[in-house]
Curated annotation (Swiss-Prot):
It comes from the Eukaryota. It is found in: Mitochondrion matrix. Signal peptide: none annotated. It is an enzyme of class 2 (transferase). Substrate binds at residues 199, 228, 239, 325, 465, 470. It comes from Talaromyces stipitatus (strain ATCC 10500 / CBS 375.48 / QM 6759 / NRRL 1006). Its main location: mitochondrion. Its EC number is 2.3.1.35, 2.3.1.1. The record marks 160-161 as: Involved in the stabilization of negative charge on the oxyanion by the formation of the oxyanion hole. This is Arginine biosynthesis bifunctional protein ArgJ, mitochondrial. GO terms for cellular component: mitochondrial matrix. Heterodimer of an alpha and a beta chain.
Length: 470
């Protein structure tokens, strides 16, 4: 038995926000004290309450990592009252940022145990900064350990922002004790922390939920997560950071497999612009504060928690796509009836990062030929996966009306352009590519499915990224 109660988008927020932008709108920050709101289309994604895990406290504090930021929070601290088991997934970019290297080393040294905090700064990536950058990242972690009264390494560190610049490390170290003294387990504290890790994001991304596990049906566990990212998103991984926290007890040996599976079907299945960053990190911490039996890889609880964590990570990662720089559409691409999952995933990824597909969607043009072209040139696809005369393409409207068939078994349909245009007016769209089982279709085989989430390309994306550093 497994019960889920999710607290996610709950309509207009109780508190107010202001979006402060630079000359051309690329830096978006938040001030909860101002009597304004975030943009109407984004407001629905901000939770007005949450159910947060026991034993975790968080804070968002202003440092001024970027000189132009004179009052907005840009230092996030997540801390557990008790040591956690932990795991993390990192960028595959060869130029791994200093905080990535330090966090990897800490997890290796501690063997996924004894992790107590995560410290994150926005405004500077501390990437490609040499030995000095490594020392800066280590000093951030060590300062938090000092606040915790711990001599062994127990803090993971993350950074996000412009590559190739050193951190104003003295300013950050001076404010870490303030961040520590501000730790709390309230909704406003979690929201402020989620805001503190934002860069070009238009809204903070935070969700939480409760769940139960088969071995302890009488215990209600909580899971909370925050993430940031709006550009340079095409995992494995992209410019996104994320922290997932639960008060369920999870054995250290189970943490990495749980996270890897969840990330493969969520954060590694999204794309905004096809670029892979130097800093990506998704960390998962479990402190066991709610009690119960530890989840191990051989227990029934493992399967139950895997379902919870994967679904949760999908919901969180989709907020990144919805906040894609300049995005006007949230697109789901579903590859059905493939002979193998990995080939389906590669095809979905190719469609998701195609500039021609993305610009056609922005222009509300039902140019299915661009989708089919991407299917045909997808790299690394197993022979016999794509058989042209078995391939079909459709648009699935969000209103529940019948799908609009564009291509059926390799034959083009007469498309109702008026209906196609109406479907493309909506913010949400699903593209279905049915491979008909590929070469295995005649045998009734080939039922694998892969899903990717992505957004369109607009004029604003070029504006934001053409002026990022100014």
């Amino acid at each position: 038995m497994m019960i889920l109660t999710k607290t996610g988008p709950l309509g207009p927020v109780t508190n107010s926000f202001i979006i402060a932008t630079t000359r051309r709108g690329q830096i978006r920050l938040y001030n909860i004290l101002q009597d304004t709101t975030i943009p109407e289309p984004k407001r629905k994604h901000i939770p007005s309450s949450g159910t947060y895990p026991k034993g975790f406290r968080v804070s968002g504090t202003h440092v001024g990592v970027k000189a132009a930021n004179t009052k907005y929070p840009d230092l996030a601290l997540i801390s557990s009252d008790e040591p956690c088991t932990a795991a993390a997934v990192f960028t595959t970019n060869k130029f791994q940022a200093a905080p990535v290297q330090i966090s990897k080393l800490t997890l290796d040294q501690r063997k996924g145990k004894g992790i107590q905090s995560v410290v994150i700064n926005s405004g500077c990536a501390n990437a490609v900064t040499g030995k000095g950058g490594l020392e800066d990242a280590q000093s951030m972690a060590s300062k938090v350990d000092e606040c915790n009264g711990i001599s062994e390494p127990s803090t993971l560190v993350m950074s996000t922002g412009v590559i190739g610049q050193r951190l104003p490390i003295s300013k950050i170290l001076d404010k870490i004790p303030t961040a520590y003294s501000n730790l709390a387990n309230t909704h406003n504290a979690w929201l402020a922390t989620a805001r503190a890790i934002c860069t070009t994001d238009t809204f903070p991304k935070l969700i939480s939920q409760t769940f139960t596990l088969p071995s302890s049906p009488g215990i209600t566990y909580s899971l909370a997560g925050m993430t940031k990212g709006a550009g340079m998103i095409h995992p494995n991984m992209a410019t996104l950071l994320g922290v997932l926290c639960t008060d369920a007890p999870v054995d250290a040996s189970a943490m990495k497999p749980l996270l890897l599976q969840a990330v493969s079907r969520s954060f590694n299945s999204i794309s905004i612009d096809g670029d892979t960053s130097t800093n990506d990190t998704i960390a998962f911490l479990a402190n066991g504060a709610a009690g119960g039996q530890p989840v191990t890889s051989s227990s029934a609880d493992y399967t139950a928690l895997q379902k919870v964590l994967t679904s949760f990570a999908q919901s969180l990662s989709q907020l990144v796509v919805r906040d894609g720089e300049g995005a006007t559409k949230f697109v789901t691409v579903r590859i059905q009836n493939s002979p193998c999952y990995e080939s389906a995933r590669r095809i979905a990824s190719t469609i998701a990062r195609s500039p021609l597909v993305k610009t056609a969607l922005y222009g509300r043009d039902a140019n299915w030929g661009r989708i089919l072209c991407a299917v045909g040139y997808a790299d690394g696809v197993t022979e016999g996966t794509v058989i042209p005369e078995r391939t079909s393409v459709s648009f699935k409207p969000v209103d529940g009306s019948p799908v609009l068939r564009l291509l059926v078994n390799g034959e083009p349909e007469v498309v109702d352009e008026e209906r196609a245009s109406a479907i493309l007016q909506d913010e949400d769209l699903e593209i279905i590519v049915d491979l008909g089982g590929g070469s295995k279709g005649e045998k009734g085989l080939g039922g694998e499915e892969a899903v990717y989430w992505f957004c369109d390309f607009s004029h604003e994306y070029v504006t934001i990224n053409g002026d990022y550093r100014t």
